[in-house]
Amino acid sequence: MSSTQQQQHQLFSAVEQNDVTKVKKLSSKKKISKSNLTSFDQYGQSALTIALKNNNEEMVELLLSLCVTLKADINTFDKNGFSALHQAVSSDDRILMRVLQYENINVDVQNDDLNTPIHYFCQKFRSPNCQEPFQLFIQKGVNVNAQNKNGETPLHKAIFNNSVRLMMVGLLLKNGANVNLATQFQESPLHYAVRLGREDLVSVLLKAGADVDCVGTKERKTPYQLAVEEGNKDMTARIKKYKDLFDWLQKHGFEQYKDAFLKEEMFLDELGEMSEDILNKMGITSTGTRLRILKETSNLANEQTKKPKTPELIIEEDPTPPDTPDISGLRHSLHTLRHVGEVNIINDNELEYTEKLGAGSSGKVYKGLYRGKEVAIKVLKSMTESKEIEEFKKEFQIMSAIRSKHVVHFYGAVLEPKLCMVMENCSRGSLYHVMDNNSLDIGWERTFRFAIETVRGIECLHKWDPPIVHRDLKSLNLLVNDKWEIKVCDFGLSRFNTGSNLETLVKMRGTFAYCAPEVYYGEQFSGKSDVYSIAVILWELVTRCINGRYERPFSEYKNLQHDFQIIIQTAKKNLRPTIPNACPESLVSLIQDCWDPNLENRPTCTDILSRLVTIENEYRSNIQTWNNLIVPLPKNQE
């Protein structure tokens, strides 16, 4: 074996064994050459390809540095026809980012099948953090409309991504992907989405202007015909809705305004409401065109038997508890947690991320799919300190212990590659956001339902064995599902009320407007502290009902500019939000009892429920009298 072959063998052996120290030693002794970095092992892999497959970030970083120093080209193909970037798109997001940041990286390099790295990225990348590497691709000038041998674009490939397909499709469309590029069989991404049976994907592609009349040469079917064949009534109806609009636009010569109609969601059943204001929103300025559109939409309205549009109503449905997922057991690190019943440890490949819902100090929240169910996925930030791990375990412990229809359902946790909590998705958002939506009519019936379900959720926690104190109860932490049911959530600050947790419970937590006075004075946080928070939520609900719009607690006190001022005033001056004058005395009394400065005087959740039922019966016996108390404030009043 020659010295060059010996060096090459030593390098490949060290990389295969993830021995970074050995590679550094070889480098320091000048035993790694440019040819070593561009050579292949018996399986046709380069040293960098091996490091990428091993997902070893430190090794990849080291080899990339050596490529720069020795001027080795990382864009060359291995014996399997793949470049380093083709391989990197299947790696951890940090590793992919590092390869993309390499100065001379070729993002459009094609393999034997003419697939570019972004083809594979769109199909195989798993992390919900797909936006950052995608933007690097864009900055490097990637061709998002590149076609492989079969004519497939990255958009076609994204349809097959089992983890982040909807997010990937969205990124592609926002960055110039042509929604109507077809394969050699004349099939568009819309054909692929219909076959997959994903109505959400179909909707996104249609809104982007997908051609509904494109006929595939293999089966001689349009996407609409495929949907009919699949027997998917909802998808068929959706595609027909777009097809009818496109046909109408073509018939009257308005095709060039298709995107404007789609953006404003002006379909055939809405065209009768066309107005000058809507045309302004659509950006249609030509006087002649505006007159023609108004004339044709008016004619259409006269032809149709129009159904009167009604404001959004809150519909009562029979409540059904969520299904309990299969249990796969606990990992060793969580097995010793006390009070934990059955819980599911979820593999990351069982999840599909569909939409980013928000971000906070603890991480990001995505909407997604788990075993066909729509879920919320809380992806926690990287946890490197033992304190952060302990906080995760405590929330995991609480979530795993509770099984109640009044508490957001916990499906399980993902432990790698990132810590995630997988929960029931409540599509209407928080109770705060529901109350803050002025288009919703929240009368007394809805107020009582929201109040009773909130208290039942907290009662469930307080009656658990051992009892659980929420500690961060507020309208933002009460979620509303599509059936308008309240679900208690966010147990990041919650604790079992046991001896070992007393010291932790003393620490001030939660939002100050909902915080009980005893917490300010450093006393033990108890179930009665949660009851104080319930009082503020009852105040929010009653005020929203009577005034017809949401008012923030303590917003009437203009001198209180900061949250900490609120807790000082509530504790030292016994300040409370102002209850509306029109509020029935029975509700006034209940709210005041719940936020009594002396925690011993506050009722239990069971007592609150009993009183709420009595008050609701009082309302039902005097519905007109109670409804007369609702006098909405002017919309422009602060």
Swiss-Prot record:
| Subcellular location, record wording | Cytoplasm, Cytoskeleton
Summarize the impact of K378A: Loss of kinase activity
Q: Which InterPro entries match?
A: Ankyrin_rpt, Ankyrin_rpt-contain_sf, Kinase-like_dom_sf, Prot_kinase_dom, Protein_kinase_ATP_BS, SAM, SAM/pointed_sf, Ser-Thr/Tyr_kinase_cat_dom
| Pfam families in UniProt | Ank_2, Ank_4, PK_Tyr_Ser-Thr, SAM_1
Q: Which residues form the SAM domain?
A: 240-303
Q: Is the keyword Kinase in the record?
A: yes
- Per the similarity annotation, which family is this? Belongs to the protein kinase superfamily. TKL Ser/Thr protein kinase family.
- What's this protein's function? May be involved in cortical F-actin organization and resistance to osmotic stress. Activated upon cell detachment, in vitro.
**What is the protein named?**
Stress-activated protein kinase alpha
Q: Source gene?
A: spkA-1
